[in-house]
C-alpha cells in the first residue's frame, strides 16, 4: 500500500480546535503517526491547516506539480447526508461554509458531512462546535478505507 500513495500530497484542511472542522487534521495525524503511506501530509492536529494558514501555504501547494493532490475536509449538508462522504475531481473552495473562500485545485476532493448546513453563518459555526464524535470517527474510518482504493483506480488500475 505504501507505494500507492508515495506520489500523493494529502491536504487535510481544518481547525483542530473546532470539533466539526477537525476531520482533516485528525486524518492528517492518523496518516502521519501510523506511517501507512509515503504521502506528504499537510494538516494535522498538532499543525492544522486552518483557513488562515492555507492562505500562506497555497503557493507551496499549487507549485508542487509532481504530486497528486487529495484534499480532505469536513462539510455541512442536509440532514440526510450527515455521515456521508462525497468525492469529486474538481477545484475546491475552502471555507465556503462560513462565507470565506480559497480555491484549490486537486485530483480528488473528499468531503465528510459532519452536520447540517444552515443559511445563517452563526448557526453553521455552532453546528461545527456541536458535532457528534461518533460521526467524525465513522467518517474517518470510511476515508481511511477508501483512500488507497481511489488512488489505485485512478492512477494504477
Where are these regions (language model features)?
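N-terminal catalytic or cofactor-binding beta/alpha core of small enzyme domains
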Residues: 1-157
Amino acid at each position: 500500500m505504501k507505494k500507492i500513495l508515495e506520489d500523493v500530497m494529502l491536504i487535510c484542511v481544518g481547525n483542530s480546535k473546532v470539533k466539526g472542522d477537525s476531520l482533516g487534521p485528525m486524518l492528517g495525524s492518523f496518516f502521519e503517526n501510523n506511517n501507512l503511506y509515503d504521502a506528504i501530509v499537510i494538516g494535522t492536529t498538532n499543525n492544522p491547516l486552518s483557513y488562515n494558514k492555507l492562505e500562506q501555504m497555497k503557493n507551496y501547494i499549487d507549485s508542487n506539480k509532481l504530486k497528486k493532490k487529495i484534499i480532505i475536509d469536513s462539510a455541512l449538508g442536509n440532514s440526510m447526508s450527515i455521515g456521508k462522504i462525497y468525492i469529486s475531481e474538481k477545484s475546491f473552495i475552502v471555507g465556503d461554509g462560513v462565507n470565506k473562500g480559497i480555491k484549490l485545485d486537486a485530483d480528488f476532493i473528499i468531503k465528510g458531512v459532519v452536520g447540517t448546513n444552515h443559511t445563517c453563518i452563526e448557526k453553521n459555526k455552532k453546528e461545527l462546535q456541536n458535532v457528534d464524535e461518533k460521526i467524525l470517527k465513522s467518517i474517518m474510518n470510511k476515508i481511511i478505507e477508501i483512500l488507497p482504493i481511489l488512488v489505485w483506480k485512478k492512477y494504477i488500475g
